């Protein structure tokens, strides 16, 4: 028997119990002891192996997005956008690409309820003919801060207090009181949208600004939008308490059960595009992740549909070991100078290497479905069998060559090295417009949630005053409403 023709299998098709090395086990119920009642012997390798494997079953959970659920399906192009991008998987209507999607909460632990007020992750991995494309977004279109330098501190503030492991409003409000750019995100998080009914009844967004490049090398900025065909549904406070109290995994179960019943969730993909030559024509910076692009002047363009029609086969292999990274793009899609995106390009891959090891892209859920070739090899948990003698490039013994060149954004970068903010902050206009677009009862719920948060006894008068000032600058009536319930005079 040639051992190299017999690869490790996930089928586990032996008719009897074995050790990891394949040795037969005749008793998987009893330890090896001295007599019927004697001490257990250390030589019971089967017991030692079984316990050692059990002790190492858990891997580090994601530092954010730990609680999640995945499903598989396909993406189908419905509208031609080849004038915008040379991406092969978007080449023509009718083209289908297999995908795996992971939905998640963001801040709380792996076993936390799915009814907490928290953004929801919406990450899509496209297995294209030109490699994988990871579109890693959320159910809300903007973010709290615009520069990734603040991201670790932001997560620390949102996470539980390190002293008592309790998430506390005073820490959150203290941190974000230094960053009025967060107001727009809070108009989503403290809105009814802050607690989706489940994963099927919410939209998704790429959040960051990317770039599309066509065959001629023309580049445009792009925002990605997923619109659910099931309609948006949310849970108000009393509903969330009831649902979460009955089943802390309700959204995971809803996704699984819906797909199992043939009720496949579906989203339509739209894009917004801006010519980089026109980026100075707006009262906001198109690369500012705390801003939305007004749809009345930058309309949504339809692209395709996402259908989830298959449940995952194994939660650990296809959810816990599933890894996304915004750096993973394909020809025709590229990054922008969005400061948060630039930070995520490094941070996500670095986090996955810590969590899963340097060869995490060899795991079946993360590996490309197309042919691939490079000299990245060895390292911890490398399980690809390779027998080549040439592991360098170039070589006259190996015919592998460079791929055909594909266009990337032609923009020229120049300027001084400096640490500074963007010029067009405009932190209050869009939050105010969003608040004024709501019905009165929705406005009241939003204000009440802020009053409740600011009523935390450890929130100081100074912090309350800062937030009332911020909301007054967004909308004077909102600031007055919050202040009146707190008996604090607006200071603007």
From Swiss-Prot:
Q: What protein name does the entry list?
A: Catalase-4
Q: Which EC numbers does the record give?
A: 1.11.1.6
Q: Name one GO molecular function term.
A: heme binding
- UniProt-listed Pfam families: Catalase (PF00199), Catalase-rel (PF06628)
Among the record's GO biological process terms, what is one?
Answer: hydrogen peroxide catabolic process
Question: Which keywords belong to this entry?
Answer: Glyoxysome, Heme, Hydrogen peroxide, Iron, Metal-binding, Oxidoreductase, Peroxidase, Peroxisome
Q: What InterPro entries does this protein map onto?
A: Catalase, Catalase_AS, Catalase_clade1/3, Catalase_core, Catalase_haem_BS, Catalase_immune_responsive, Catalase_sf
PANTHER family the record matches? CATALASE (PTHR11465), CATALASE-2 (PTHR11465:SF23)
Q: Where, by residue number, is the active site? A: 65, 138
Tell me the domain of life.
Eukaryota
- Does the keyword section mention Metal-binding? yes
Tell me where it resides: Peroxisome; Glyoxysome
Q: Which family does it belong to?
A: Belongs to the catalase family.
Query: Which Gene Ontology terms of cellular component type are present?
Result: cytoplasm; glyoxysome; peroxisome; plasma membrane
Species the sequence originates in: Glycine max (Soybean)
Name the cofactor(s) required for activity, per the record: heme
Q: Where does heme bind?
A: 348
The record lists the catalysed reaction(s) as: 2 H2O2 = O2 + 2 H2O
User: What does the annotation say about its assembly with partners?
Assistant: Homotetramer.
Protein's job: Occurs in almost all aerobically respiring organisms and serves to protect cells from the toxic effects of hydrogen peroxide.
């Amino acid at each position: 028997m040639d051992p190299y023709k017999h690869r490790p299998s996930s089928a586990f098709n032996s008719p009897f119990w074995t050790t990891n090395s394949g040795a037969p086990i005749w008793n998987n119920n009893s330890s090896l002891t001295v007599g019927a009642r004697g001490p257990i012997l250390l030589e019971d390798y089967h017991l030692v192996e079984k316990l050692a494997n059990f002790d190492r079953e858990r891997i580090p959970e994601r530092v954010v997005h730990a609680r999640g659920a995945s499903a598989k399906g396909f993406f189908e192009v419905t509208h031609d956008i080849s004038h915008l991008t040379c991406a092969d998987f978007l080449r023509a209507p009718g083209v289908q690409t297999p995908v795996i999607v992971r939905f998640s909460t963001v801040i709380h632990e792996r076993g936390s309820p799915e009814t907490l007020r928290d953004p929801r992750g919406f990450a899509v991995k496209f297995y294209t003919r030109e490699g994988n494309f990871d579109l890693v977004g959320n159910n809300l279109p903007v973010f709290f801060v615009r520069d990734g330098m603040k991201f670790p501190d932001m997560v620390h503030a949102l996470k539980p207090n390190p002293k008592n492991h309790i998430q506390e409003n005073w820490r959150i409000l203290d941190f974000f009181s230094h960053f009025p750019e967060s107001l727009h995100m809070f108009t989503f998080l403290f809105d009814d949208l802050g607690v989706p009914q489940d994963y099927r009844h919410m939209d998704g967004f790429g959040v960051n600004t990317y770039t599309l490049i066509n065959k001629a090398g023309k580049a445009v900025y792009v925002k990605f939008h997923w619109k659910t065909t099931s309609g948006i549904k949310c849970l108000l406070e009393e509903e969330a308490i009831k649902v979460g109290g009955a089943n802390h995994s309700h959204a995971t179960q809803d996704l699984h059960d819906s797909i199992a019943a043939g009720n496949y969730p579906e989203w339509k993909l739209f894009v917004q595009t801006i010519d980089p030559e026109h980026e100075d024509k707006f009262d906001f910076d198109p690369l500012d992740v705390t801003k939305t692009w007004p749809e009345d002047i930058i309309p949504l363009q339809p692209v395709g549909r996402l259908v989830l029609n298959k449940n995952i086969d194994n939660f650990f292999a296809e959810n816990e070991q599933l890894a996304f990274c915004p750096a993973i793009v394909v020809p025709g899609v590229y990054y922008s100078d969005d400061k948060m995106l630039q930070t995520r390009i490094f941070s996500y891959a670095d986090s996955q290497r810590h969590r899963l090891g340097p060869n995490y892209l060899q795991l079946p859920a993360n590996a490309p479905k197309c042919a691939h070739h490079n000299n990245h090899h060895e390292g911890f948990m490398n399980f690809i069998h390779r027998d080549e003698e040439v592991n360098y490039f170039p070589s006259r013994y190996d015919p592998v060559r460079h791929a055909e060149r594909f266009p990337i954004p032609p923009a020229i970068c120049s300027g001084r090295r400096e640490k500074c903010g963007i010029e067009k902050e405009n932190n209050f206009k869009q939050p105010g417009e969003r608040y004024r677009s709501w019905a009165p009862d929705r406005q009241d719920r939003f204000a009440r949630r802020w009053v409740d948060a600011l009523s935390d006894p450890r929130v100081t008068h100074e912090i309350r005053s800062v937030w009332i000032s911020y909301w007054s600058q967004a909308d004077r009536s909102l600031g007055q409403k919050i202040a009146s319930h707190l008996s604090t005079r607006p200071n603007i």
